[in-house]
Structures are given as C-alpha cells and as structure tokens.
C-alpha cells in the first residue's frame, strides 16, 4: 500500500511526525486521513499547519493513502489506533461498510468526518460541504452551459462515498424537468488510468455528448485532457469540482466553463481545532444536527484570476 505521512509543521520536509524532537512522543497526535492523493488535500494540509502553529503541544499529521479504497482506509485507521492517536478526522470512502470500523475508532479517540460523511457512525460531527447543495450548484452551472439542453456524463471515484452520492443527487434535482439528459455516471475507484479510459470511451460512444462533469478533484483535469486530445475543446463543455491547477487553467483558457470549489483549508483547520476542543471537554462547537457546513463557491472566467492568485499565496507557489 502506498502511504504518505505528511508533516504539517511549516518548514519540515522529512516524512514522519509533524513535530519532531526529544519530546514528540509525549505529545498527543491528531491525524487527518484522506480518501485520495490530490491538490485538494495539500490545501487541507495548510489548514492543519495553521492549527499546528497554534497548538505546538500536539502532533498534527496529514495521512495520504495511495490506496483509495475502504480496505485501505481500514488499515490506516487500525495503524493509527495501534499508535494511540488522540483524534482522527477522515474523508470516508465507503460509509455503509465503514460504520463498524469507525465506531471502533470513536470508542478510543475523538472521531470527526470531513469532506465525505458517515452519518450512521458515532463520529462527533461532520465538517465540510453540504454536498447535495453543491450538486445543485453544479447543476445550475450545467444548465447555464447548455441552455438548449443536451447529453451529459458524470465521473466520480466511487458512488459508495456519501459526497459522491449526494452530489449526483443534487445535480439530478437541479436538472429535473430540463432538456439536459444524463447518459450515465462513471466510476473509476480513483484509478486515473481507468478514469481517463472512461472519458475517452464516452467521447467515442456518444459523439454528441454536450458536457462532461468530474465530481472529484482529479477528474476535471482528466476530462480537460481527454476533450483536448479528442479535438473537442470548446465543443464539449466541462463543469467540475475543486481547484486543481489544471482546472483553473482550463477555466482561464475557456475549455472549462466553471468549477464548484470547497474550502479544504477550513476542513483541515477546523478538524484539528475542534478535535482539540473536544479532547479538552468542549463540544459547544458541535451543531445540533452534527454537521458543521463550510460554504462552497462557483469559480468561472469572471473570478478565476483572483481566486488563482489567492490560492497561489496560500500554497506558497
């Protein structure tokens, strides 16, 4: 299993604990476990860095697994429990089949979900996007791109993840009663080669496809590549999710119409800060419905330059 343990203490580049040194082992550890390797989680890591600076008494880690499966996440969680971590925030890959494992974690550590929820588990709260609402936003962007309707295809890593199911739901709700036709939703298990193949196949099978939409961060750049390679840039519209650099470039050059961006920086920061509050006996931050919603934003040609500049400053690129 490919596994990357990313330190989130600014200036530390070696893999390992976020806070190294003679007394690192005396500090409680907090970890954010991702569901894939993507720029999205690099941004979340910057939020963890802020929390680390504010709370040097903790070790705060970003754990990126290259095996983006429920089984891979279970192994990560088991390893963290063996290491005795105090708190975990996780983007859940397969909520229906993860509940038992998550409840085991919740019995031993503070558990928060972020990005993709597991509402049936004993997690303290979910921190992230209202994904149904984000799906509706994407649906509105699709309608803008296709005022006369047309065929569309959706692409996502897996429909086992709550955020994927909810985004599809929101898109369908927004498009109900229009002339936009969803031909299918394609999954790739976060296998970039399979994702690319899915997109290429759609372009061949549906020569009249009007729009393609990637629901996870890595898919929109792959759609961008596939459409350009097929010579259909500008003909096949693209609406995506998240702020991958290639997605933003595609918006700038007019190949991509828009993208729905979340606030992964806040996902990281709020996860760490609120785990620490909970460890200290403070749960006043938990909303009544157990969901701390972070707003989304539409990025298109009108605001992409400003957004890209802010993102560059955040990432130090």
Locations of the language-model features?
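Bacterial N-terminal signal peptides
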Residues: 8-16
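A residue-level marker of the well-folded mature domains of exported/periplasmic proteins
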Residues: 3, 13, 22-317
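Bacterial N-terminal signal peptides that target proteins for export
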Residues: 1-8
């Amino acid at each position: 299993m490919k596994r990357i343990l990313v330190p989130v203490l600014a200036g530390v580049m070696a893999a390992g604990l976020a806070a190294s040194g003679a007394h690192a082992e005396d500090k409680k550890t907090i970890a954010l476990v991702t569901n894939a390797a993507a720029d999205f989680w690099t941004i979340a890591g910057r939020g963890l860095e802020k929390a680390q600076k504010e709370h040097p008494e903790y070790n705060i880690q970003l754990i990126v697994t290259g095996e983006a499966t429920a089984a891979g996440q279970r192994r990560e969680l088991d390893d963290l429990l063996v290491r005795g971590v105090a708190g975990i925030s996780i983007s859940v890959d397969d909520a229906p089949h993860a509940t038992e494992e998550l409840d085991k974690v919740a019995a031993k550590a503070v558990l928060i979900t972020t990005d993709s929820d597991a509402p049936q588990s004993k997690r303290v709260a979910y921190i992230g996007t209202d994904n149904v609402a984000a799906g509706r936003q994407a649906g509105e962007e699709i309608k803008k791109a296709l005022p006369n309707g047309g065929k569309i295809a959706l692409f996502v890593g897996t429909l086992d993840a709550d955020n994927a199911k909810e985004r599809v739901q929101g898109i369908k709700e927004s498009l109900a009663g229009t002339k936009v036709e969803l031909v299918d939703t394609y999954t790739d298990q976060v296998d970039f080669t399979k994702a690319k193949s899915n997109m290429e196949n759609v372009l061949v099978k549906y020569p009249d496809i009007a729009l393609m939409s990637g629901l996870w961060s890595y898919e929109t750049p792959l759609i961008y590549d596939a459409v350009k390679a097929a010579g259909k840039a500008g003909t096949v519209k693209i609406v995506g999710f998240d702020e991958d650099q290639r997605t933003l470039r595609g918006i700038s050059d007019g190949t991509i119409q828009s993208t729905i961006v979340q606030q992964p920086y806040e996902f990281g920061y709020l996860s760490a800060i609120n785990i620490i509050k909970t460890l200290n006996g403070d749960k006043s931050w938990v909303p009544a419905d157990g969901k701390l919603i972070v707003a989304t934003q539409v990025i298109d040609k009108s605001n992409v330059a400003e957004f890209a500049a802010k993102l560059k400053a955040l990432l130090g690129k």
